[in-house]
Each structure stands twice: as C-alpha cells, then as structure tokens.
A protein has these predicted regions:
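Extended catalytic cores of very large enzyme megasubunits
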Residues: 1-288
C-alpha cells in the first residue's frame, strides 16, 4: 500500500499492536485482520463475518473508532468505546474525589470522558460544618486536569476530557475566561450549557441571574455574558456552546434521562454513564 509517511507514523504510534513478547502487526493488513477477527467472534459464522469486516476495512469503506483499531484482538484489558460521560458529581469532597478516581480508571483503559461541573457550589460559597468557603468548580477542574496529564490513556495517547457548566452558574464568567491562561486546563475541552431562557434574555437585552441552590449570587446583563463567550471563542477557540434544552427536547429518551454533558469532542451528547461507539463511513468509495 502506498501511503504518506505521516500515515505510517500514526499507525505505528497509535494503532499498531506490539507487545513485549514480540508479537506485533507486521503491516496494516495484519492490523485489519486482527480487528476483523476480533469483531467477528460473537457472530454465528465468525469466518464469514471476519472476511466481510476485513474487506470493508481494507477498502476503507468503514473504519471503526481508534479504540477499536488499537484494542480489538490484542488481549489487553482496554475499552473499545472511545467516549463516556461520567456520573453526576456530588457537591461534597468524597463524591468529588470518587469521580476523580473513576475518571482516571476510565482514561487508563482508553476512554475519553465528559463531566458536568454545574453541580459544584461556586467559589466563595460557605461550606457548612467546616468553617470554610468553597473554592468552586474551576479549582476542582484543575485537579482533573493534573490527573489527566499523568494518565497515558491505553498506552499511547493522552486522556481527553470535556467540561460543561451551566450559563446560570455563579462561576460562569471565570469558566468562560479560564483559558486566557495558556497553561491552565489544557487537557479539557470546555463548553457552556446554554438554555432557551438565556437566549431569550439575550434577545431581550434582559438581566440574567447567576444562581446556585436556589440562591441568586449575582445579576448581570445576558447580552454581556453572551458577548463575553463570543469574545473568548474568537480569541482562543473556547468555550464551545451547547444548546442544552434543544439537546434534551430532541433526545428520544428524554422521558427517562437528562443530558448535561457530551463526549470530549462534543459531537455526542450523552446521559450520565452513557457511552458512544464511534465509526466512520467513507461515502467517497461507496457512492458512484
């Protein structure tokens, strides 16, 4: 196969199977054969399906996601799912660090993760019983970010994370501006959960309350916050915007689940503990 040097390097670094005992994929076709055989194992006629899968891969008609190519048929204890949204983070220290541990183990096995940090009380809010003030969701995002920097996800790639925060959270301005510091939260993609009520307030040039736990912490102009988000996106490409009410309205399972986050790249909204198995269909070779 005639392929570009960069393609060869990516295959060799990220998807080629090699183990300390010396077993390895000799070439790309060996990778396709390994993946096809592994995916065909559950079928009633594995040999027939392995051939069909291998033909699709060899012709680049369909490519499964990277975790499938890297992990299928290797015998390693890794996930074949690329992306997850983790469970809700409780607003207490035990739940926060239980979620950090869960995220670390998920990324160690190859999964990218999404988290909604809107459940954490804002910076300066009192913490009853300990005589202290909360440090806010961004301080704990720094903990996730440091953890992610130390995790080599499934052997050959760094972890990937998405952080979301509601547009009415009292720390939303700090969230929007967080990446003005080029060294901060580099392992995160970040998105604001924008509601229909907020967009209406922007259109009406109305006031917008920043609230948590039923208490209004501050009030600002909705249009000022919207323009702040747009300036940040223009200047350093983040945060993104997720129209979360529309996402939930169009979810076929809206009657039994609530979506508040997406996978790391943002293309797949998921409920808590939801997972997505990704793949690419190459229409260029399927359509004449």
């Amino acid at each position: 196969m005639d392929w570009a040097p960069v393609s060869q390097r990516i295959w060799d670094m990220k998807y080629r199977f090699c183990d300390p005992a010396g077993a390895k994929d000799e070439d790309l076709q060996a990778t396709w054969k390994r993946v096809a055989r592994a995916l065909a194992e559950p079928e009633k006629d594995p040999e027939a399906w392995a051939g069909r899968f291998e033909e699709a891969l060899t012709g680049f008609k369909f490519l499964p996601a990277g975790r499938v190519i890297a992990g299928a048929g290797t015998g390693r204890t890794v996930t074949l799912f690329n992306c997850f949204v983790m469970g809700a983070i409780g607003d207490d220290m035990a739940s926060i660090f239980d979620n950090v541990k869960e995220a670390a183990l998920t990324m160690q096995q190859g999964g990218g993760i999404g988290h909604d940090f809107s459940t954490l009380r804002p910076n300066g809010a009192p913490v009853r019983g300990v005589g202290a003030d909360a440090s806010g969701p961004l301080s704990f995002m720094d903990v996730w970010d440091s953890m992610c920097r130390t995790i080599m996800s499934a052997g050959s790639r760094r972890g990937a994370m998405m952080a979301t925060l509601r547009c009415d959270h009292p720390d939303i301005e700090a969230f929007v501006d967080a990446k003005r510091d080029p060294k901060r939260l580099r392992m995160f993609n970040m998105s604001v959960l924008v509601t229909d009520a907020f967009m209406q307030a922007v259109k009406d040039d109305a006031d917008w309350n920043l609230v948590f736990g039923g208490k209004t912490f501050r009030t600002l102009k909705a249009r000022d916050l919207w323009e702040r988000i747009m300036r940040a996106t223009y200047e350093y490409a983040e945060p993104g915007v997720i129209f979360i009410d529309r996402v939930n309205r169009r979810n076929n399972l809206q009657y039994c689940e609530q979506i508040q986050a997406t996978n790391p790249c943002g293309e797949q909204p998921l409920p808590p503990y939801g997972a997505c198995l990704l793949g690419s269909i190459n229409l260029a070779v399927l359509v004449k």
